[in-house]
C-alpha cells in the first residue's frame, strides 16, 4: 500500500474506531477517496452507487393462536428498510462490491427493522462484500454475495446473500437456446472444534427464445446441505422443520431437487407483459413431509411512471419440504404452510413505487394435540419504495 493511502487509513481508523458501524463507513471511504497519484488511473473506473429505502405499515391478524401465551389479537407495526451499495471495477477483470443494510445481523432472511424499542437507533450491518471476476462467458465470485441461482421465495428468501464461492458459465453459439451452468460452495457455519456446516449446489438453466413475444426459462438445481450442529442457529432458523428429540439437530437431512419454469409473454403490448413462474422442490434427505411447490402469475411491469403490475401466488410447503433458515419470511410460517398472495404495484413517479400485498395463509398440517382450529391468518402490507 502506498504511503499516502496508509496515512489516510490510519487517520480514518483513529476517527471512527469508537463504533463498529463507523469502521464500516471508514472502509467505504477508503475506497471512495483515492490519493491524488491514484486518481488519474481510476478515472476510467468510477465508483458506482445504488440504494433503496422502503417504509411499510403491516397488520397481521391472529398472530399465534395455540402458542403460550395464546396470542389472538391483531398486530400493527411499522417497518423500514435501507440499503446502500457500492461497486467498482478494479481492472479489466475484477470488480469489488459492498453493501450496507438495515436489519438484524443474526437474521439472513430480512433487512427490515421494526420501528419502536423506545426510539433506539437502527441497526446497520455489512450484508455484502465480494470480489468478482468476469472473463468472456465465465463468472467467478467470492465473499458474501447475491444469490447467483435462479430462484423463487419457496426455497430462497430474496434477502439471503450467500457466503463462500460461486461460479457460472454461459454457453454461447445458439440464439434460440442459451444454457447456463452455476455452482456454489456455501459456507453456513464454521466452528473451531465441531464439524462445519455448508452447502454444495449446482444449477443448469436453459433460456429459450420461442418467438419475438415468448420466452421460456427452465432451471433444475440440486442443493446438498451438510448441517452438523445448530449451536449457532436462532429460533427463527429452525421454525417448522422437524428436530431430534433433544432439539439439538435437524431430524432430516436437506438435499433438495428444485425445478423452476418461467414463461414470459409480451403479446398483450409493451405495458402489459405476462409472467408465469412455477417451482417444485423435493427434499431427498427427508423420509416424509418432504415436498413444496408454488405458482405465481404477474401481469404488467414497474419500469416507468404510471406503470402497474398485479400478482397472484399460491404456495404449499411441508415441514421439511423447505429449509426454514433460508426460505421466505413474508409471514409467521416459514414451513408447513399453505399460502395465497395478492400484490399490486404502481409507479407514482420515476423510481417511486407504491405497493399493497395481502397474504392469507395457514398451517398445512396441524397436530390434533394442539386442539386449535386450523383457520387462516391474514397479513396486509402497505409499502412505499424509493430507488436511487
Task: Give the location of each predicted region.
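Short conserved micro-motifs at the rims of enzyme active sites and ligand-binding pockets
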Residues: 231, 322-325, 367
Amino acid at each position: 500500500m502506498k504511503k499516502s493511502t496508509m496515512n489516510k487509513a490510519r487517520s480514518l481508523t483513529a476517527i471512527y474506531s469508537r463504533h463498529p458501524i463507523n469502521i464500516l463507513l471508514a472502509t467505504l471511504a477508503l475506497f471512495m477517496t483515492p490519493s491524488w497519484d491514484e486518481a488519474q488511473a481510476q478515472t476510467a473506473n468510477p465508483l458506482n452507487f445504488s440504494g433503496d429505502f422502503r417504509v411499510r405499515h403491516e397488520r397481521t391478524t391472529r398472530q399465534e393462536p395455540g402458542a403460550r401465551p395464546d396470542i389472538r389479537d391483531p398486530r400493527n407495526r411499522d417497518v423500514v428498510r435501507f440499503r446502500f451499495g457500492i461497486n467498482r471495477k478494479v481492472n479489466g477483470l475484477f470488480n469489488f462490491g459492498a453493501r450496507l443494510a438495515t436489519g438484524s445481523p443474526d437474521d439472513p432472511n430480512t433487512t427490515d427493522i421494526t420501528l419502536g424499542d423506545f426510539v433506539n437507533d437502527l441497526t446497520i450491518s455489512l450484508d455484502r462484500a465480494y470480489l468478482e471476476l468476469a472473463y468472456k462467458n465465465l463468472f467467478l465470485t467470492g465473499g458474501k454475495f447475491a444469490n447467483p441461482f435462479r430462484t423463487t421465495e419457496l426455497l430462497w428468501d430474496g434477502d439471503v446473500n450467500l457466503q463462500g464461492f460461486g461460479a457460472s458459465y454461459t454457453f454461447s453459439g445458439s440464439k434460440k437456446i442459451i444454457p447456463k451452468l452455476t455452482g456454489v460452495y456455501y459456507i453456513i457455519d464454521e466452528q473451531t472444534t465441531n464439524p462445519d456446516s455448508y452447502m454444495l449446489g449446482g444449477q443448469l438453466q436453459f433460456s429459450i427464445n420461442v418467438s419475438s413475444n415468448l420466452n421460456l426459462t427452465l432451471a433444475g438445481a440440486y442443493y446438498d446441505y451438510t448441517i452438523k450442529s445448530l449451536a449457532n442457529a436462532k429460533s427463527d432458523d429452525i421454525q417448522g422443520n422437524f428436530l431430534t428429540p433433544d432439539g439439538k439437530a435437524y431430524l432430516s437431512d436437506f438435499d433438495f431437487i428444485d425445478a423452476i419454469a418461467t414463461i414470459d409473454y409480451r403479446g398483450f403490448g409493451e405495458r402489459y407483459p405476462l409472467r408465469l413462474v412455477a417451482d417444485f422442490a423435493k427434499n431427498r434427505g427427508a423420509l416424509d413431509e418432504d415436498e413444496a411447490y408454488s405458482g405465481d402469475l404477474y401481469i404488467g411491469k414497474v419500469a416507468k411512471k404510471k406503470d402497474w403490475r398485479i400478482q397472484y401466488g399460491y404456495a404449499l410447503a411441508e415441514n421439511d419440504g423447505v429449509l426454514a433458515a433460508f426460505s421466505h419470511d413474508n409471514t409467521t410460517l416459514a414451513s408447513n404452510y399453505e399460502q395465497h398472495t395478492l400484490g399490486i404495484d404502481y409507479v407514482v413517479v420515476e423510481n417511486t413505487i407504491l405497493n399493497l400485498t395481502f397474504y392469507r395463509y395457514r398451517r398445512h398440517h396441524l397436530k390434533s394435540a394442539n386442539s386449535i382450529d386450523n383457520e387462516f391468518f391474514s397479513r396486509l402490507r402497505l409499502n412505499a419504495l424509493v430507488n436511487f
